[in-house]
Curated annotation (Swiss-Prot):
InterPro entries: FAD/NAD-bd_sf. Gene3D superfamilies: NAD(P)-binding Rossmann-like Domain. It comes from Archaeoglobus fulgidus (strain ATCC 49558 / DSM 4304 / JCM 9628 / NBRC 100126 / VC-16). This is Uncharacterized protein AF_1314.
Amino acid sequence: MDVIVGGGKYGVEAARFLEKRSRDYVIIDRNPECLAMRELDLVRVDSIEEVKEGRYFLKGGIEILPSLLKFKPEYIFPTAPLHVAAEALRLKFDLKPWNEVLDCIIGNLPARVVVSAGRGSVVVSYNRDADCLEKCSAPDICPVTKIKKPCPMHDLVKFAYPDAFVLISRQLEPGLGAISGEELAKLMKQAEKREKIVVATACRCHGVITALKRA
């Protein structure tokens, strides 16, 4: 049972990818009239207990993602417009931004990859100043900037803060990536016993780094 966070355009693309491979999934979104409900044949359920085999829509936000890990999803598609893994941690463990460590992280990153920083997070990209191509295959040489990437962004993030827990968004097809459900479950266990934690989600080209601490 895979999990799609967000029922918009990219959530629908993720669902169609899974359907082509005959995989079960559940989409979570706060809006019961979202694009996924209009375009896909989904069974709407009101609780996690109702999710069995099949394709489901469950109304709710990031706060229910940790509970869905009991299904041992292989893929989690973080299509919502926020740092899904970090927000799941923040809500589950009542964390707040750890702003003091941001300067350390930014200081270890090339200035040209930093898109924005603040409120405990740093957004990074090898294509900082332009829009990416639709359905990009993420080659070593960026088709927009024409610059060769020195390494995948997830490796650069790990270099910038070696103690970070980096979730790799792996490309499943051009323009579509997912993180590992097993890795997210490991992150949740680590966060249980940490006073402070830095979590990042990154693919080959882009990433977001979020620092959190106990409230």
